[in-house]
Structures are given as structure tokens and as C-alpha cells.
Amino acid sequence: MFGDHLSGIYEKAFDPAISWEERLLRARELGFNYVEISIDEKDERIARLYDSGAALSELRAACANTGMQIKSMCLSAHRRFPFGSADAAVRARARDIMDRAIDFSCELGIRVIQLAGYDVYYEPSTPESVRAFREGMLWAAGRAERSQVMLAMEIMDTPFMNSITKHMGYEAMIRSPWYKVYPDLGNLSAWGENDPAQELARGMGSIVAVHLKDTIAVTDSCEGKFKCVPFGSGCVDFTARFAELERLGYKGPYMIEMWYADGTSDTAEIASAAKWLQERFAEAEKLVGGSSNA
């Protein structure tokens, strides 16, 4: 799909009514190598981490029956239960969710947990919330290191963690081989202060995977749009970003992040997005001398 890179597709790109086995089967038939599972702030998704075993058994069976893997987790539950909360009970819940997400990943063979880079989301950010977030990240990295599960910070839709440069400060502080970065090309491109080419170069050696998503840029007159932007209608120059990553020698996976819309065909929408992105990747290959086969 994207040269020699593995390709992933987000769980939420599919109709939520279908089973995991059907979701994985559709992903395989569309040409993907794996699916990224979502543990967001909804109770039913957080509950997966607290299940007595039924959820894991279903997922293991679905993977075995389809020959597909769930290789990564998008862990955005910390938007609701942030490490930087002023409430000690919320901070404790953040750690419990992280602890269970790591155990869940070990049980299922998930390699990478993508973290949400918010000190807080529904509370005001303060020096105390930033300090608590740092403490939480130090703890989380140690917990992940013990279990050999990679934690990778997403570049976000708020100023707190909206660049690879900001992440690298945390990486330097934490100093763990199990705490890296998982940039979202859409979020990275939406902030005018970012030079995406320089940001990607700065992160090389730390980038474990890349989210493919389009966005509407943040400007003085527009707050930006970070979700459900059709590929090709936003601000991301995918050809340039692919070319930069290829020149830098990036070998990790590309993961398409998109969301199912009611009344649509998930397979048709995903196939259309994948085709469009493959065309941009082919353009990038020409720019760098055709070093891979699309």
C-alpha cells in the first residue's frame, strides 16, 4: 500500500455495529496489515480494560480467525481522566487506566500505545497541572519499560503538545527507550508555528508510527478542524510529508485515521481514502527517486 511500510487502519473507520472479526476481515480485504484499537473516554471503551476476560477472548479469537493483528492502541481516555487533574482521585484513575492499558496490550500483543498529550482537557491548565502531568509521564514510562510496551506521544489539537519539538523536551527528561513519539501529520500541519519538515527531521530516531489525517489549519480567524476532514480538502501536503519521511529513512508504519459516518459504506470510504493517499505516496516516491515500490 505504502511501499515497504506496514499500513494500519483505525477502528473507528468502520461501522461500530459490526463485530471485531468482521472489522478485521474488512481491514484485511482492503489491504491493511493491522487495525489500531481505540480506548477513548467513553465508558464502553474504557470498560474493555476492566473486562474479566471476555473482551480479550473475543479479540484473540477474531485475530486468529482472520490472520490479522491489532498492533497499536489509541489511548485517548486520559482526556477525561488526565494525569494533570487537580483532583487526586482523577489522577489515580489516570494511572489505573494506564496500568490496565499496558496489561491489556501485553495480553493482546499490542506493540505501541499512543498517548494523548493533554495535561488537562476539561480543566484549566496551570503550573500544577503541568507538573502533575510530568510526574505522570515519568511514572507511565517506567511502568511501560518494565513490561516492554512502547508509549508514544501523539502531536495534539491543542497548544500544550502541538509539536514534536515540545514532545522532545519530555523525551529528554524521561530518558526511556519506551517513551517516544507518534505524530499525526494533520495535527502537526495545522499549527502555523510548525515547520512540518523541520519537525519530522527533529523527531527522526523517535518516531515509531505516523497517523495519516487531514486537518483545517488554525489561523487568527479559524480555530481549525482536527477531525472528519476529507483527505485532500485540508492543509496537509501529503506528498511533501511522505517525501520528507522517505528521505529521512523512516521505516515505520503509516496508520490511516478516519471516522465512520452514519449511512455510508465504511469499506467504500476507506478504499477511497487509501487510494488517494497511495497516489500521494507514489508522487513522493518520484520526488525521492523511486526508492520503494508502491
Question: Language-model segments: what does each one mean?
Answer:
Residues 21-25, 62-66, 81-180, 268:
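Active-site acidic/histidine proton-transfer and metal-coordination neighborhood
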Residues 1-8, 13-33, 160-183, 189-294:
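Histidine-acidic metal/acid-base catalytic patches
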Residues 36, 72, 114, 152, ...:
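Conserved beta-strand positions in the central sheet of alpha/beta enzyme cores
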Residues 40, 78, 118, 215, ...:
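Flexible loop residues that form catalytic
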Residues 1-107, 138, 176, 205, ...:
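N-terminal pre-domain/capping segments
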Residues 33-34, 69, 111, 150, ...:
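Residue-level detector of anion-binding/catalytic polar loops
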Residues 7-10, 43-46, 85-88, 124-126, ...:
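A short, structure-level motif marking secondary-structure boundaries and short turns
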Residues 43-47, 79-85, 121-126, 189-191, ...:
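A short acidic, helix-capping loop that chelates divalent metal ions and anchors anionic groups
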